Amino acid sequence: MAGIGFELKKLFRRKGLFASLRAYGYAGIICTGPMLLGVALQMGILLLCGWVGAERAQQDLLVCMITYTLLFSLTVTSFFSMPVTRYLADMLYEEREQAILPSFWGSSSLMLVLGCSLYGLFLLVSGATLLQGLLCLWLFAEMIVNWNGMSYLPAIKDYRGILCSFLAAIGLAFGLGLVLVVLLGFPVPEGMLFAVAMGYGLMMVWDVVLLYRYFPQSDESPWPFLKWVDEFLPLAFTGLCTNIGLFAHLVICWVGPVGVQVKGLFYGAPYYDVPALIAFLTILITSINFVVSVEVNFYPKYRDYYSLFNDGGVVGDIVTAEEEMLAVLNRELRFTALKQLFVTAAVLSLEGTLLDLLPLGFNDLMHGYFRTLCVGYGLYAVGNTILMILLYFTDYRGAVTAAAVFAVSASGFTALSMAFNTAFYGFGFLIGAALFYLVTLLRLDAFTANLPYRVLGQQPIVAETRAGRFTRLGLFLETKSAARAKHAAGEEREDE
């Protein structure tokens, strides 16, 4: 990702307002991808439904179905995304580009089988109609591929193509939704679900075409990436726990006093969900800043420091390089925190005026949730930036510990807040995010206090290869694929 930041930095150096807007647009899509699309579509759908006068029950059902699909797909992909990203980085470093496309389809197919099976079972008993269930499952499958694709797309550095796919998806979803619901009179849930699925589908096809233009096709096995899941299992749990901490408070509020049963097993908390969605957008600045500023300025010092260990640098040079690297890191993290603080303060100052202009029905309780969650998401954003730095230093144990603290504390304190007045519900996530920030900060400070020992003394003397369940699953799938290919080749020879 530091390489992506260097490329984006070139765009930021160009003068002019439009050049800066384009650079921030590219960075935003690279950093947030389908999640930003999901939030934008959610807000757009609410505005469109309000404009056409749709019933509140239909709006709530539509929002619930899209939100459930988003969160379920995020949960499935969050476990595999970091190991897959590590596999991609290793293949690029080893110049084995021919292994990348097979791993994309292998990881996508594995997540599709797992996710569609579980989500399909939920939809069967959820109370959704057959058409609604099929549309949700279709949208879920597209989101799985899109989420997985965002691990691969930054490597191609075709920012214009990625941005065009994003804008085309939004345009198609809104345009088709307008035609189906307003002009043709389709029911709101089914019509808008179909429109959103078509938008995500266009983005999926567009992004896959971009990948095929850049990476070579090959007949290599699609399953070696599973060895990386075993090898870097803490990365998998780091992604999963971070996802749980980020979204568990929404699910808990759905079944709490502010939650409502929309239909069957579809629950929602409109007074809480809408402020949470808008507050989530405030972390965009920190996400972009991490790629185009923190990594870009930190990475050269980081590379120089570790190259001294690899190339036989003297002790004096290593000490000097370490001091320079940590000074840059501290400066960039401080600037990141200040930028997020400024954005959060500005949003809190203006939210009363701006949100009342939108036809979202904000009341005093929703304004309170929004302010609380803005602070919580701001703390999460800075904590997540520090977490990424821990991963830079390969402190996987510290990263997974911090992520687990975030998941447990955000979920636990949110559940505990259900016993208090509804005005305090957002504070559970706020406390969890604050603990996440503190744990990551303290861990980074402790880890970098004795960095040479971490680099040299904690490395294993003998290299070990972990062959766990995922490795065995990969070998099993490779055996089955080889047997199937051999059988197909035998049938072809018989036909000849």
Question: What does each of the following model-derived ranges do?
Answer:
Residues M1-L41, D60, C64, L226-L235, ...:
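N-terminal membrane topogenesis motif
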Residues S165-Y212, A423-D445:
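Hydrophobic alpha-helical transmembrane segments
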